[in-house]
Design a protein with these regions (language model features):
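Alpha-helical transmembrane bundles and membrane-interface segments of multipass inner-membrane proteins
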Residues: 1-140
Length: 140
């Protein structure tokens, strides 16, 4: 796709940006498998006990949970880690002395679902909170 988008095969034993991939196996399994199951359980409990979510918020929560479950299934099914395969070129981002980024870290559809739905949920909560207080939040 002209170098902007590449399909690659990367096994990621960590989480976003491969954070934690150098941790011991038992610690990784707890942090990246057991803990997410607990968090998903809590999200489900809140989701089904709360009747104040808008339809958009409910869809966003489903997208987050679906992405999380997709990554968990991949993590349990593959000892070598979650498969990431979408590699996107971005304009060079650099903060002198801190970091530079020439390509976005490789990700998968579940990651995209989680990130996009989290953004939708945050904006939706901000709009809902602004509407309840009688004003719109700045910039929205």
């Amino acid at each position: 796709f002209g170098g902007i988008l590449r399909l690659v095969h990367v096994s990621n034993t960590g989480v976003a940006f491969s954070v934690g991939d150098s941790l011991p196996d038992t610690v990784r399994r707890f942090l990246f498998a057991i803990l997410p199951l607990v968090v998903i359980g809590i999200v489900f409990a809140v989701y089904f006990k709360n009747n104040t979510f808008t339809k958009l918020q409910r869809w966003a929560i489903c997208g987050i949970v679906g992405g999380g479950l997709g990554n968990l299934i991949d993590r349990f099914a593959r000892a070598e880690g979650v498969v990431d395969f979408i590699d996107v070129d971005i304009p060079n981002i650099a903060v002198p002395g801190l970091f530079s980024l020439e390509r976005w870290p490789t990700f998968n559809v579940a990651d995209a679902s989680i990130v996009v739905c989290c953004a939708i949920l945050i904006v939706s909560f901000m709009k809902t909170a602004g509407a309840e207080s009688g004003r719109k939040p700045d910039g929205i």
